[in-house]
UniProtKB/Swiss-Prot annotation:
It catalyses: an alpha-L-fucoside + H2O = L-fucose + an alcohol; a neolactoside IV(2)-alpha-Fuc-nLc4Cer(d18:1(4E)) + H2O = a neolactoside nLc4Cer(d18:1(4E)) + L-fucose; a neolactoside IV(2)-alpha-Fuc-nLc4Cer(d18:0) + H2O = a neolactoside nLc4Cer(d18:0) + L-fucose. The keyword Cell inner membrane does not apply. GO terms for biological process: fucose metabolic process; glycoside catabolic process; lipid metabolic process. This is Tissue alpha-L-fucosidase. The record marks C282 as: May be important for catalysis. SUPFAM superfamilies: (Trans)glycosidases (SSF51445). GO terms for molecular function: alpha-L-fucosidase activity.
Amino acid sequence: MLLLLLLLLVAAAQAVALAPRRFTPDWQSLDSRPLPSWFDEAKFGVFVHWGVFSVPAWGSEWFWWHWQGDRMPAYQRFMTENYPPGFSYADFAPQFTARFFHPDQWAELFQAAGAKYVVLTTKHHEGFTNWPSPVSWNWNSKDVGPHRDLVGELGAAVRKRNIRYGLYHSLLEWFHPLYLLDKKNGFKTQHFVRAKTMPELYDLVNSYKPDLIWSDGEWECPDTYWNSTSFLAWLYNDSPVKDEVIVNDRWGQNCSCHHGGYYNCQDKYKPQSLPDHKWEMCTSMDRASWGYRKDMTMSTIAKENEIIEELVQTVSLGGNYLLNIGPTKDGLIVPIFQERLLAVGKWLQINGEAIYASKPWRVQSEKNKTVVWYTTKNATVYATFLYWPENGIVNLKSPKTTSATKITMLGLEGDLSWTQDPLEGVLISLPQLPPTVLPVEFAWTLKLTKVN
């Protein structure tokens, strides 16, 4: 009898040990959830801002707010000069046709760019949903405009190519009557949250099973108004994506850079030293807007080398790099955006070994005759230098060589010659080749094995 009791106790203890951990709806518990490994390994993603704002395609994706919220004169003038009296923002929606949107073409482009995840705007602050939301009647892509489920179509296309799928979702809607009512009540009521925000979040998760939820539009209210912790506890405990899903930190005005999964902190966040928490830099190829603009100029488009430098720096500091593009109202990705994405992909084909699944090294960067950023993987150190030194020699002060040290350049055959200088560090002789023969045009990566 005693033996049976002991066996039952052991079995019960094992059952408890094997039971999945449950998270409670508070930040102390939710913040303790380990980040699924796929996100840190991915490193590079593509952000897509697409919605009714792609129709006027002027100024920025905040067009509606600047026109009728803070009533900026330039936006007032644009409407007066280009549209008849009485034209409303809702009148733009039928022109959001997505007629040339071929999700497989988009997915092929993102794959060629080397992206490991893609994040699509399901709903921006204008409130228009890119899926048939049951609580957004006649203000969604199925009822008006494209008459298509844009979220579902792109998700199917990217997942066929083993690209992770993330969904951007704005918590607030600028002009929704229930949101304005809650604002009038000092956010002491939650009419909008209960009728709109939370039903849509649960619907997105259950319908599309996203790998990532990119929350935004949180800044006017605390997380208690949004019921964020209750949603995240369900997401981590009971949702169909509970084991793999990732979230960011925009769940209330008190959360950015403090609570959530990984940290965005603010748009285009770029720390100067290694943070102690996983983070992501989200930035836009058009430096002046996230949505497509018909009036953009080359001066606002990030150059290829600028994008790659940001990617290298971000990864060296332990972050992910999420690069945004804005398609047209018709569903086209304009050639300049395609060119930039393909340039990143070409660079990653050669240097991706130093990026994907890498970790920050003990020293993240140094600057001598060029700027160098370090990463490491499987005891190998990678040093990416941004500018080719005039004397053809890269000196690295941080790595400590051994008699077995070997140094190569990614994309080239053969070892590079090097010497150890007591003051200058490792002096590496670069190959004497014309630029057309080098593996890439900028940001070359040295691979160092058997170094300390």
